[in-house]
């Protein structure tokens, strides 16, 4: 039997998992590159203690949990319907269900060929590598032997980009695109990670070029900005707040280019935090497009990606 495993970072399923999510994320050596395990655990613990109260408050505003799992389950259901002969499941990096649980499912169903699809459109050591590494290490640890396939990215996939275009058009609901500046908001990374050879920035920039070539001159202008910065180190620029300041007085549509599924970074940061900033500084109109989520076109893209693996 064959199986598709959708990999993602995960998100708290309830408020009690907020601390677990933060602790696991900051203890990831791909996120916090401290070689000494004990030191990294200590630093992760300290960061978690400093951030958990605010993070918990943010998730309370989202109904007490991350929306990521909801959208993932809906996506799996539609993908499973499209591929009835393939077992479709998920494995999250920082919250349940973890890779170990997914592997137990695969072993129970006697799956001998596994297609791992990290739901990150652009490759990064902090996301794609981390999720794949975690899954393979867990499979090796429990003695699970199968034929494995995986992908590094899929931002060039034609159907995936059609899914994005559909979301952008849907967000404007018939309004004149020429009146809007389209801002692609990408999850930021520390500059040091890029300088060490991580291809994330290059792939995001290439993706923006692909999308703008499809959209041609429909919008007044196209921009790339970065969100979700954390800590005092130098991060990718410009920040989304800086870009909003630059474009204040104009109509702005934001598309979260780093994400395939809506999560706290879209539904809290973009829809709530940055919306408040936009209103405060005088942005004429501020809109955020939804991620592809479980759209039919994104399901088409995943089927296409699977069939090409």
Curated annotation (Swiss-Prot):
Residues that coordinate or bind Fe cation: 187, 265
Biological-process GO terms, alphabetical: heme biosynthetic process
EC number: 4.98.1.1
GO CC field: cytoplasm
Pathway where this protein functions: Porphyrin-containing compound metabolism; protoheme biosynthesis; protoheme from protoporphyrin-IX: step 1/1
GO molecular function, one term: ferrochelatase activity
Keywords: Cytoplasm, Heme biosynthesis, Iron, Lyase, Metal-binding, Porphyrin biosynthesis
PROSITE patterns on file: FERROCHELATASE
Catalytic activity reported: heme b + 2 H(+) = protoporphyrin IX + Fe(2+)
Enzyme type, top EC level: lyase
Family (UniProt): Belongs to the ferrochelatase family.
Name of protein: Ferrochelatase
Native source species: Nitratiruptor sp. (strain SB155-2)
